[in-house]
Amino acid sequence: MYRNWRDLISPKKLQVESESLTNTYGKFFAEPFERGFGTTLGNSLRRVLLSSLQGAAISSVKIKGVLHEFSSIPGVTEDVTNIILNLKGVSLKMHGNEARTVRIIHKGDGIVKAGDIVTDANVEILNPDHHIATCSKDANLEMEMVVKLGKGYVPSDRNRDEKAPVGTMPIDAIFSPIKKVNFTVSNARVGQMTDYDKLTLEVWTNGSVVPEDAVAFAAKILKEQLSIFINFDEEAEPAEEAETEEERERVNENLYRSVDELELSVRSANCLKNAGIKMIGELVSRSEAEMLKTQNFGRKSLNEIKDILADMGLTLGMKLDGFPDPEVMRRIRGERKDEE
């Protein structure tokens, strides 16, 4: 049963396009996947990235002299509704888990930007040039805003706090630190085969989390959600069958047999010869991906070899400690001479 996942081809590592990598953008590549896995994983990662990563946002605001969002403020060009819309665009990063209160106090004419928000050490403004309001010389703008952590989109009614002072207006909050995610799936080559998937993932963030970490967090969330479906211990996978000493001895001898004894097709035999593979032990120590990289070695030859090895109790990708063993080789040679 363990061959269900052991025999699948999978990427060795995630590649990053270093030339375009920034704190807000990253392009990632992973290949080869079995056909269909690129779309499955790409779509899953995209949905988790957009919906499930934690971030910080302004959840409510209290403006001095204002009781509701349909008011206007003397000396301020924007009405309260537009100011609230502008506050939604402020990108923040929090270094703690507790909600924090930040403030804006501005008198006289000028442009009020996100950089004018007075914060403490636990809150960082990531887009200080973001426009909030335009004030004239007789303006007196004082605001208190609550910043908290969350995930996804939270409507204003869920941000309402019954204990908040009169005049506090809840805001629709977009907590997600991810601005956009794209993924594409193209063909990947393994040996002579081109029917594998290559996943390309592009991630844009607001800067509160770097793209590499965002992808890692999303993958971790997926792993945790899927773990309940695994009904066995991953730490110590049992062998499919307990081998007797006699069976183990027979398998060992098979490893030292020549690949010519496998009676492969001419094409497969020539591929092994060109790859310098002489003994069955050398063959089974190669993975499927490594074999498919061999010149002229395709899926048909791979399946032929896998079937023959399976009849011998062997598989590709085996870890052979101490192979070849000189003592075993001498014993086998001696037995063959006696037979002659």
Swiss-Prot record:
Pfam families assigned: RNA_pol_A_bac, RNA_pol_A_CTD, RNA_pol_L
Superkingdom assignment: Bacteria
Q: Which InterPro entries match?
A: DNA-dir_RNA_pol_insert (IPR011262), DNA-dir_RNA_pol_RpoA/D/Rpb3 (IPR011263), DNA-dir_RpoA (IPR011773), RBP11-like (IPR036603), RNAP_asu_C (IPR011260), RNApol_insert_sf (IPR036643)
NCBIfam families tied to this protein: PRK05182.1-2 (NF003513), PRK05182.2-1 (NF003515), PRK05182.2-5 (NF003519), rpoA (TIGR02027)
Q: Report the GO terms under cellular component.
A: cytoplasm; DNA-directed RNA polymerase complex
Which HAMAP family does the entry link to? RNApol_bact_RpoA
What is the protein name given in its UniProt record? DNA-directed RNA polymerase subunit alpha
Q: How does it assemble?
A: Homodimer. The RNAP catalytic core consists of 2 alpha, 1 beta, 1 beta' and 1 omega subunit. When a sigma factor is associated with the core the holoenzyme is formed, which can initiate transcription.
Q: Which GO terms describe its molecular function?
A: DNA binding; DNA-directed RNA polymerase activity; protein dimerization activity
Per the UniProt entry, the Enzyme Commission number(s) are 2.7.7.6
Name the gene for this chain.
Answer: rpoA
Q: What keywords would UniProt list here?
A: DNA-directed RNA polymerase, Nucleotidyltransferase, Transcription, Transferase
What is the annotated role of this protein in its UniProt record? DNA-dependent RNA polymerase catalyzes the transcription of DNA into RNA using the four ribonucleoside triphosphates as substrates.
Instruction: From the UniProt entry, list the residue stretches annotated as the region Alpha N-terminal domain (alpha-NTD).
Output: 1-233
